[in-house]
Curated annotation (Swiss-Prot):
UniProt lineage: Bacteria, Pseudomonadati, Pseudomonadota, Alphaproteobacteria, Candidatus Pelagibacterales
Record-linked Gene3D superfamilies: Ribosomal protein S8
Protein name: Small ribosomal subunit protein bS21
Name of the gene encoding the protein in the UniProt record: rpsU
Pfam families in UniProt: Ribosomal_S21
Keywords: Ribonucleoprotein, Ribosomal protein
Family under the similarity heading: Belongs to the bacterial ribosomal protein bS21 family.
Amino acid sequence: MKIEVKDNNIEQALRVLKRKLQRDGFFKVVKLKSVYEKPSEKKKRILQENIKRVKKLNKLKNRI
């Protein structure tokens, strides 16, 4: 990932980097990998994420 620093404005470049990492899901992966997750908990989490995604898609379809 490449971020341009304009006018030596490091703070703005850091904000842009953080925003891009957030959109890519980097922080979520780091959080999940920082602690061991039991296989049963992993299956449960993935199932909940799938249900949430399906509900979100159905909600968007109903809007249109």
